[in-house]
UniProtKB/Swiss-Prot annotation:
Highest taxon listed in the record's lineage: Bacteria
Active site: D72
Biological-process GO terms, alphabetical: nucleotide metabolic process
A Pfam family reported for this protein in Swiss-Prot or TrEMBL: Maf
HAMAP family xrefs: Maf (MF_00528)
Predominant place of localization: cytoplasm
EC number in record: 3.6.1.9
Function field: Nucleoside triphosphate pyrophosphatase that hydrolyzes dTTP and UTP. May have a dual role in cell division arrest and in preventing the incorporation of modified nucleotides into cellular nucleic acids.
Species this chain originates from: Pseudomonas syringae pv. syringae (strain B728a)
GO CC annotations on file: cytoplasm
Family to which this protein belongs: Belongs to the Maf family. YhdE subfamily.
Protein name, UniProt field: dTTP/UTP pyrophosphatase
Record-linked Gene3D superfamilies: 3.90.950.10
Top-level class of the enzyme under EC nomenclature: hydrolase
Length: 200
């Protein structure tokens, strides 16, 4: 079985991958995340996920039997990607734009080894209730929005804004587990390895 590496600094992706019982090692993979002109959100997240996986693979010894996972998430409103907020004003503008509306969250996950690569893209729809400006300001002071695509974390304090979700909850958090498990299986890496040897 190949060794699995996760090319991501996201603690949320580490937690999700741990949740499905897959051992892995974290790698640092820095790539340029600037969107191309006229690039669709789906093409953008797929390119970044694959780029992270390939960048991670490139730092490993060539003789090592390894598989590297990369992932990327984008929050999309009216066809526009909402990245991580640069400051408080940006975060508040994002939250007020999302207020009372439905938006899309696209997450791509990619796996690659020395012979091949494969990707999955999962699109979910999230609807926010109306958000008051004082709520958005209070949420900013929590520190939670600063490093999150779209300026919010569905698994955190922003859960109270969510009226509904269609799609993959784990995908919105940062790693769609159903599709991730399918990809891992194609590369010979089973989930639930934590259960091996437990015959009781």
């Amino acid at each position: 079985m190949p060794s699995l590496y996760l090319a991501s600094g996201s603690p949320r992706r580490r937690e999700l991958l741990t949740q499905i019982g897959v051992p892995f090692t974290v790698l640092s993979a820095q790539i340029d995340e600037t969107p191309f002109d006229h690039e669709t959100p789906a093409a953008y997240v797929e390119r970044l996920a694959l780029g992270k996986a390939q960048a991670g693979l490139s730092v490993l010894p060539a003789e090592q039997q390894a598989c590297v996972m990369g992932a990327d998430t984008a929050v999309v409103l009216d066809g526009r990607i909402l990245g991580k907020p640069v400051d408080e004003a940006d975060a508040l503008a994002m939250l007020m734009a999302l207020s009372g509306r439905e938006h899309q969250v696209l997450t791509a996950v990619a796996l690659c080894d020395r012979q091949r690569s494969d990707t999955r893209i999962v699109t979910s729809r999230v609807r926010f209730r109306p958000i008051q400006i004082h709520e958005a300001q209070a949420y900013w002071t929590s520190g939670e929005p600063a490093d999150k695509a779209g300026g919010y974390a569905i698994q955190g304090l922003a859960a109270i804004f969510v009226e509904g979700l269609q799609g993959s909850y784990s995908g919105v958090v940062g790693l769609p587990l159903c599709e991730t498990a399918e990809l891992l299986g194609h590369f010979g890496i089973p989930c639930w390895q934590c259960l091996e040897g437990d015959k009781s």
